[in-house]
Amino acid sequence: MAFTYNYSLQASYPSQRAYVPYQQAQVPTPSPIYSLPITNTTTAGALSPSSCFLSVRQQPKEALVTVKGKEKFRKPLDPPPMLELKVSSEIDPSQQFLQNPYLFVSVSLYKHDKDEAIEGTPFDILAGTLVSSLHRLKDVNNKDGAFFIFGDISIKVQGTYRLRFTLYELQPSYFTLSDLEQHKDLERYQGAALDPPEYGTYQCLGHVLSDKFNVVLPKDFKGLEESTYLSRAFSDQGVRLRLRKEARGMMSNKRSISGSGDLTTDQSQQQQQQQQPLAKKRREDSVESANPSSLMSGFYQNVSPFVNTPYLQTQGLQPQNLQNQGLQTPVRHDANYAWNLAYDPSFMGS
């Protein structure tokens, strides 16, 4: 069979090199596989509910109820729930499950006295990140472990509840680009949309329930506690968690102790004035400026008694003469006299 030459392309090839026919230059390339690689397919397929052990390493204690419409002001469940997954060494002696990208845990809200879920969709009763993938982290004993961390969970309903954590494994199916093209050709041939090809399935490997905790109103909320050692250890390894150095109650106690130490009364008052909000100080200053007696109280202390002024001397009025006449010493406590004395030269003898 003779090949047809494409002479229009010969000019682009060097003259010293032999020309390769156009049809022979086409090298077939394999269709790519659109799927994540599995490090160990035998291990990933061997996981079963009987070989997986899911436990809660850090239990939640208290949560502040989240008001609907104000989710950005919410506070996460404290302390953040943390789970650990262990697989039997007989099934996975090399611990390949630590690198399995198909393991994830979802959370749901359950009643505290019954094994029943709370009625409603998850978005109506929970807020935040409700799914966690596997984190390979160093435990407190410096050994690798598989952990699932929920550092951003809030509850929208008040009461006493528990959290149910369910472990899943995604089992993807391998399909090539040619399979996808055949599916599209079949849709065009039949003139109707067909169900998409199966991308994979998943299986449930178990679940675990947390201890009961309270979801309270802001007036009953005790505040976030100090971050645990486990939370700090995982945060140092790159996990995004909200850390708190001291509990809120301890910080308030420290303020009260430092404020009521060996300070005198004047020093404690000055410290309270410094800690007073600026807006409150401005309101008090405005009230004092509106009161004439408080406005001129400092002025009276400087100019009274007015017995040595030139004005009184020109009138021949002395303190003893005023007292003999049954009059009081001219210490005036009205705003008009004080202003005249300050601004009228005749009152000052100038």
UniProtKB/Swiss-Prot annotation:
Residues 250-296 are annotated as: Disordered. Residues 46-244 form the Velvet domain. Disruption phenotype: Produces only albino pseudothecia. Reduces tolerance to oxidative and thermal stresses. PANTHER family: SPORE DEVELOPMENT REGULATOR VOSA. Keywords: Nucleus, Sporulation, Transcription, Transcription regulation. A motif (Nuclear localization signal) lies at residues 274-281. Forms a heterodimeric complex with VEL2; the formation of the VEL2-VOS1 complex is light-dependent. Residues 267-276 have a biased composition (Low complexity). Pfam families: Velvet (PF11754). This is Spore development regulator vosA. Induction: Expression is negatively regulated by VEL1. GO terms for biological process: sporulation resulting in formation of a cellular spore. Residues 253-266 have a biased composition (Polar residues). It comes from Cochliobolus heterostrophus (strain C5 / ATCC 48332 / race O) (Southern corn leaf blight fungus). It is found in: Nucleus. Its main location: nucleus. The gene is VOS1. GO terms for cellular component: nucleus. The N-terminal velvet domain contains a NF-kappa-B-like fold and is involved in DNA-binding. Component of the VEL2-VOS1 heterodimeric complex that plays a dual role in activating genes associated with spore maturation and repressing certain development-associated genes. The complex binds DNA through the DNA-binding domain of VOS1 that recognizes an 11-nucleotide consensus sequence 5'-CTGGCCGCGGC-3' consisting of two motifs in the promoters of key developmental regulatory genes. Required for normal pseudothecium development and regulates asexual spore compartmentalization, pigmentation and germination. The keyword Acyltransferase does not apply. PROSITE patterns: VELVET. InterPro entries: Velvet, Velvet_dom, Velvet_dom_sf. Belongs to the velvet family. VosA subfamily.
